[in-house]
């Protein structure tokens, strides 16, 4: 069934990568009124703790993000990617890198193939994601600071080596979720087929894997410990004042899934490294997904996006 949120968009799909004969899809989402010209690009990554979620899952699609793309006649590219635990963090990072290669090398030809007369503007590329997608939006901005101008990270996972992600505790109950036995995860891992990947699932599918990984503090073990997977460590290694995208972070102060204080700390780290004016943090009352009812006229969001637009649209 078509998502009513996408009723005003033309949505097409293709794959940007094949792994072990399995395609990894992306979705090109263009406002229906956009037929010609050189529109900007908004690359979107979905949430789901890197374990669940799907690029087109409607409940996690913030209406304001679609309205923002429409406002600027932007091409929104929402991509799936390999998921934990079937894959590792470096595999996901490889997918992000290859997605941008596809955008640079194949998007223009793909648009012609589907009969579109628009030409993507590679001088105006932004990334956006929610939760785990916010983490990937940040990572992609750091990986491709030559291409990405601003990053919008909504309640992003950032410090995946902190106790919230790395130490077992019964205090972690996103939205009041129950404690799930680790046996659920162990059984899934034992049944995994070698070489078979997972690339997208509409919740609640796979959330029964995300919860025990979070509650048992297994993220570093499941993801891997390579420093490139941890954005604060990546930022730490950069030179002061080095070129980086502008970063807008949005986070609800009562978030039960991803701690808001992590975003507060990350904003400080980003500003210290990339200097004043390189980042804006908007911290408002609410739980995970607190922006679900926000509109482009909501003052804190309007203010944050105006800073993004100055860098992205110019």
Residue ranges and their predicted role:
Residues 163, 176-285:
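Serine-hydrolase catalytic core
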Residues 257, 286-299:
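Catalytic histidine-centered segment of alpha/beta-hydrolase-like enzymes
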Residues 1-38, 87-93:
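N-terminal cap/lid segment of alpha/beta-hydrolase-fold proteins
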Residues 43-45, 154, 283:
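Alpha/beta-hydrolase
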Residues 98-180:
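Primarily recognizes the serine-hydrolase "nucleophile elbow" in alpha/beta-hydrolase
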Residues 23, 32-69:
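Short, surface-exposed "cap/lid" segments of acyl-processing enzymes
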Residues 294-314:
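Catalytic active-site module of serine/aspartate enzymes centered on a nucleophile-bearing elbow/loop
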Residues 17-19, 55-64, 77-124, 293-300:
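Catalytic nucleophile-loop/oxyanion-hole region of alpha/beta-hydrolase
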């Amino acid at each position: 069934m078509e998502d009513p949120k996408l009723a005003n968009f033309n949505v097409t799909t293709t794959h940007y990568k094949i792994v072990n004969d399995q395609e990894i899809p992306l979705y090109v989402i263009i406002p229906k009124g956009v037929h010609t010209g050189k529109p900007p690009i908004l690359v979107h990554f979905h949430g789901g703790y890197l374990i669940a979620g799907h690029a087109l899952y409607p409940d996690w699609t913030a209406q304001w993000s679609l309205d923002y793309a429409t406002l600027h006649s932007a091409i929104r590219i929402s991509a799936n990617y390999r998921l934990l635990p079937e894959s590792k963090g470096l595999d996901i990072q490889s997918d992000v890198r290859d997605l941008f290669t596809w955008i640079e090398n194949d998007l223009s030809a793909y648009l012609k193939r589907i009969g579109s007369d628009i030409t993507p503007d590679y001088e105006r590329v932004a990334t956006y994601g929610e939760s785990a997608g916010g983490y990937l939006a940040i990572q992609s901005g750091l990986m491709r600071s030559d291409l990405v101008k601003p990053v919008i990270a909504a309640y992003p996972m950032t410090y995946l080596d902190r106790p919230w992600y790395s130490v077992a505790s019964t205090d972690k109950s996103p939205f009041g979720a129950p404690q799930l036995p680790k046996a659920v995860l162990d059984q899934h891992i034992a049944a995994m087929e070698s070489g078979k990947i997972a690339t997208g699932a509409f919740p609640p599918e796979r959330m029964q894997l995300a919860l025990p990984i979070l509650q048992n503090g297994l993220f570093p073990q499941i993801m891997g410990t390579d420093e490139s997977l941890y954005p604060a460590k990546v930022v730490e290694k950069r030179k002061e004042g080095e070129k980086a995208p502008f970063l807008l972070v949005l986070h609800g102060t009562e978030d039960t899934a991803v701690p808001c204080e992590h975003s507060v700390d990350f904003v400080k780290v980003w500003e210290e490294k990339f200097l004043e004016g390189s980042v804006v943090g908007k911290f408002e009352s609410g739980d995970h997904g607190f922006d679900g009812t926000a509109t482009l006229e909501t003052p804190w969001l309007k203010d944050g996006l105006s800073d993004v637009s100055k860098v992205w649209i110019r």
